[in-house]
Amino acid sequence: MSMLCYTLIIAFLIGIWAAPKSEDNVPLGSPAKSDFSDTNCAQTHEGLKTSRNTDQHHPTPKKSEDQELGSAANIIVDPKLFQKRRFQSPRVLFSTQPPPLSRDEQSVKFLDTEDTLNRNIWANNENHPVHNQGEHSVCDSISVWVTNKTKATDIKGNTVTVMVDVNLNNEVYKQYFFETKCRNPNPVPSGCRGIDSRHWNSYCTTTDTFVKALTMEGNRASWRFIRIDTACVCVISRKTENF
């Protein structure tokens, strides 16, 4: 019996000695949880002040519209990506300098492997000059280099982001597109030039085609077929005869 009492007393003393003494780590007069929450609140409040002051001196930058619109000078493009480029078009040019604005500027040199193809376009146009002996275009068109194309429609009909600036080998290249559009849907009052308006309705319209261009897919550059304006044609329809 006495042995059992001694055992219970020893177990009781061991239990008291092993109990955690949270008061040892707490300032006098304040419970443990109170100090922890007060400290956290103070740190949180101080953090909010610091964050607020930081925001005042350095406002949070908005999401770069240039990256969304294709200005990807900060995105480095692997040169191997250009080795995988297929179906090259003379209407797409990557250059560090602006391309010629018109075919009259023969002194401007292209900085792209498509230089020969582009010069062939100018040569073909010059080998067939327009004379005054009745040789006139059915529609009047204008061709320009587009330097700020940021959005386009791909071959699946989706709107994609076109890269304007390309960082290649630590040099920033711009992506240019040579587009042709109608200058006027009705070059003459009756519609297209040279069409018999007594029997035909006519008007000029811009047509497009697909070219391989460098686009953004998330944070990566990829080749896609996009739609650009490439020609001005005449659309005709027979007039209905009234009896």
UniProtKB/Swiss-Prot annotation:
Keywords annotated in UniProt: Disulfide bond, Glycoprotein, Growth factor, Lipid-binding, Metalloenzyme inhibitor, Metalloprotease inhibitor, Protease inhibitor, Secreted, Signal, Toxin
Region (Disordered): 47-70
Tissue specificity field: Expressed by the venom gland.
Carbohydrate-modified residues: N148
Cellular component GO terms, alphabetical: axon; dendrite; extracellular space; synaptic vesicle
Keyword Glycoprotein applies: yes
Compartment annotation: Secreted
Basic and acidic residues bias: start-end ranges: 47-66
Signal peptide annotation: 1-18
SUPFAM superfamilies assigned: Cystine-knot cytokines
Role description: Nerve growth factor is important for the development and maintenance of the sympathetic and sensory nervous systems. It stimulates division and differentiation of sympathetic and embryonic sensory neurons as well as basal forebrain cholinergic neurons in the brain. Its relevance in the snake venom is not clear. However, it has been shown to inhibit metalloproteinase-dependent proteolysis of platelet glycoprotein Ib alpha, suggesting a metalloproteinase inhibition to prevent metalloprotease autodigestion and/or protection against prey proteases.
Protein name: Venom nerve growth factor
Taxonomic classification: Eukaryota, Metazoa, Chordata, Craniata, Vertebrata
